[in-house]
């Protein structure tokens, strides 16, 4: 996973709330056996509308999504995070996220930055007044820079640390490889094992 420190990208105003994971990527797009290639399914039901924000320039090149409250609610669907990232998003800004989506985002490298709803409304207005507005999100300082405005955002320390270090679940385990190997070497031979095939 790529470490996240600072990202600058075009802001995209998605004026919708209660966006569940099935709206982010409908189930019909979940048949792949790989972890990439899900961008075509992102907001597929809405993207058939030519006036949908991601069909409009310059928002079709955006990488900072600003959304209403309760984004990513519903079923656990890692594909929702993967679809956002495959499309090019690195940051999602909202006043409230679904808990499971929030966890999946941090594990995959997508920053879910939580701000006050007034700040979401303010960002929407800024972006709509100046389409193509670049927003800079600094994870180390936990702030969002848009035009001349600096807004703080919330993220738990553990998720911030993982993002800053670029640590997915596998990388976390590999950091403990010496301890894992020491444990395995001391494990009694009569206990069951899962060994690689040769």
From Swiss-Prot:
Output the Gene3D superfamilies linked to this UniProt entry: Aconitase, domain 4
> What task does this protein carry out?
Catalyzes the isomerization between 2-isopropylmalate and 3-isopropylmalate, via the formation of 2-isopropylmaleate.
Instruction: Give the classification, highest ranks.
Output: Bacteria, Bacillati, Actinomycetota, Actinomycetes, Mycobacteriales
Reactions the enzyme catalyzes: (2R,3S)-3-isopropylmalate = (2S)-2-isopropylmalate
Task: State the EC number(s).
Answer: 4.2.1.33
Annotated pathway, please? Amino-acid biosynthesis; L-leucine biosynthesis; L-leucine from 3-methyl-2-oxobutanoate: step 2/4
Fill in the subunit field for this protein.
Answer: Heterodimer of LeuC and LeuD.
Give the family per the record. Answer: Belongs to the LeuD family. LeuD type 1 subfamily.
Name listed for the protein in its UniProt record: 3-isopropylmalate dehydratase small subunit
GO cellular component terms, semicolon-separated: 3-isopropylmalate dehydratase complex
Q: Which UniProt keywords apply?
A: Amino-acid biosynthesis, Branched-chain amino acid biosynthesis, Leucine biosynthesis, Lyase
EC class name: lyase
PANTHER family noted in UniProt: 3-ISOPROPYLMALATE DEHYDRATASE SMALL SUBUNIT, 3-ISOPROPYLMALATE DEHYDRATASE SMALL SUBUNIT 2-RELATED-RELATED
Q: Name one GO molecular function term.
A: 3-isopropylmalate dehydratase activity
Q: Which InterPro entries match?
A: 3-IsopropMal_deHydase_ssu, Aconitase/3IPM_dehydase_swvl, AconitaseA/IPMdHydase_ssu_swvl, IPMI_Swivel, LeuD
Q: Which HAMAP family match?
A: LeuD_type1 (MF_01031)
**Annotated source species:** Mycobacterium leprae (strain TN)
Name the CDD domains for this protein: IPMI_Swivel
């Amino acid at each position: 996973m790529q470490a996240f420190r600072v990202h600058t990208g075009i802001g995209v105003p998605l004026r919708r709330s209660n966006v569940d994971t099935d709206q982010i990527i409908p189930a019909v797009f979940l048949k792949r056996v790989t972890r990439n290639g899900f961008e075509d399914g992102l907001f597929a039901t809405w993207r058939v509308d030519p006036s949908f924000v991601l069909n409009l320039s310059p928002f079709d090149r955006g990488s900072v999504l600003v959304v209403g409250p309760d984004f990513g609610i519903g079923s656990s669907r890692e594909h929702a995070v993967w679809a956002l990232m495959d499309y090019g998003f690195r940051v999602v800004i909202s006043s409230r996220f679904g808990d499971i989506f929030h966890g999946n985002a941090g594990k995959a490298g997508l920053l879910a930055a939580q701000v006050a709803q007034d700040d979401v409304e303010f960002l929407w207005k800024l972006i709509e007044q100046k389409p193509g507005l670049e927003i800079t999100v600094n994870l180390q300082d936990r702030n969002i820079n848009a035009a001349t405005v600096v807004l703080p955002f919330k993220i738990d320390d553990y998720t911030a640390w993982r993002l800053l270090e670029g640590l997915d679940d596998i990388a976390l385990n590999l950091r403990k490889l010496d301890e894992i190997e020491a444990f395995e070497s001391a494990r009694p031979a009569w206990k069951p094992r899962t060994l690689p095939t040769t």
